[in-house]
Each structure stands twice: as structure tokens, then as C-alpha cells.
């Protein structure tokens, strides 16, 4: 059984110079540190899982959950000691995406900077590709 993590939003990125990488998803140092902090309180979990669900005004939304195991069709990204599993349904939507963690006075959230997005809703929680 998995538990929801925290809020996540998505940003369309234009004219981003893609860097060659073998991983479908890269993490910023801020995202790595936050995931490590969250997993410290959940020793029974091995990482976080990114999924995609149909919802919102633009069609798709990312989900983040704690996970205890790697699913058979999950892609695994290991970066700086953090394990992120990507559900099969989300793999193509995440190619070239950077996962960041942003905090300010009003909110804190994971942000997916995705160069493949064609549009987002006003709040940034749903997108289309």
C-alpha cells in the first residue's frame, strides 16, 4: 500500500536545452534533499513513485507516493542515493523532465519542469502533451 506524498505542480518549459542523460527524469539537489528528508521518517519505504492520472481541466496530473517496492513495469531512477520509480503510464510523459522542490512563504511543492507539455491549467496542477 502506498501513501500520498506532497503536492506537485507542472511547468511547461520552452526552449530548454536538453542535456544527454540515460534517466527519463533528473532531480535537482533541492528535490533530492526533500525526498531524503521525507523518507527518513518512513524507513519501511524504499523510494517515491511518480504516476500520472487523468484529472484536472487539462487532462493529466502527476502523482507522488511513497513506495515499498519496485513494480514490474516501473522504471527506476537512482540519483544521489534517492530512488524514484516511474509508473509505466507516466514514462513517456516524463522524458527530459527535471523534478524540483520549491519552497516559499506561501507554499512548498515538487515541480516538474517538463519540455514536452503543450498546455497547463491556470493553477499548474494539470497538463496536456
From Swiss-Prot:
Provide the primary localization. mitochondrion
Annotated compartments: Mitochondrion
A single GO CC term, please? mitochondrion
**Cited Pfam families:** Fe-S_biosyn (PF01521)
Known InterPro entries for this protein?
A: Fe-S_cluster_asmbl/transfer, FeS_biogenesis, FeS_cluster_insertion, FeS_cluster_insertion_CS, HesB-like_dom_sf
Please give the tissue specificity annotation from the record for this chain: Detected in cerebellum, kidney and heart.
Please list the GO biological process terms of this entry.
iron-sulfur cluster assembly
What residues does Fe cation bind to? Answer: 57, 121, 123
Against SUPFAM superfamilies, the record matches this protein to: HesB-like domain (SSF89360)
PANTHER family given in the database record: IRON-SULFUR CLUSTER ASSEMBLY 1 HOMOLOG, MITOCHONDRIAL (PTHR10072:SF41), IRON-SULFUR CLUSTER ASSEMBLY PROTEIN (PTHR10072)
Primary role: Involved in the maturation of mitochondrial 4Fe-4S proteins functioning late in the iron-sulfur cluster assembly pathway. Probably involved in the binding of an intermediate of Fe/S cluster assembly.
Q: What is the disease in the record?
A: Multiple mitochondrial dysfunctions syndrome 5: An autosomal recessive, severe disorder characterized by early onset neurological deterioration, seizures, cerebral and cerebellar leukodystrophy, dysmyelination, cortical migrational abnormalities, lactic acidosis and early demise.
Q: Which family does it belong to?
A: Belongs to the HesB/IscA family.
What does the subunit section of this Swiss-Prot or TrEMBL entry state? Interacts with CRY2, but not with CRY1 (in vitro).
The name on file for this protein is Iron-sulfur cluster assembly 1 homolog, mitochondrial
* Organism of origin: Homo sapiens
Amino acid at each position: 500500500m502506498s501513501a500520498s506524498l506532497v503536492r506537485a505542480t507542472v511547468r511547461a518549459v520552452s526552449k530548454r536545452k536538453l542535456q544527454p542523460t540515460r534517466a527519463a527524469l533528473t532531480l535537482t539537489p533541492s528535490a533530492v534533499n526533500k525526498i531524503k528528508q521525507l523518507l527518513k521518517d518512513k524507513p519501511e519505504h524504499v523510494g517515491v513513485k511518480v504516476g500520472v492520472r487523468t484529472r484536472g481541466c487539462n487532462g493529466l496530473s502527476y502523482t507522488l507516493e511513497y513506495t515499498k517496492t519496485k513494480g514490474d513495469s516501473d522504471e527506476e531512477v537512482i540519483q544521489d542515493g534517492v530512488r524514484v520509480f516511474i509508473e509505466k503510464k507516466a514514462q513517456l510523459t516524463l522524458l527530459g523532465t527535471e523534478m524540483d522542490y520549491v519552497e516559499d512563504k506561501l507554499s512548498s511543492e515538487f515541480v516538474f519542469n517538463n519540455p514536452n507539455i503543450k498546455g497547463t491549467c491556470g493553477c499548474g496542477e494539470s497538463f496536456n502533451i
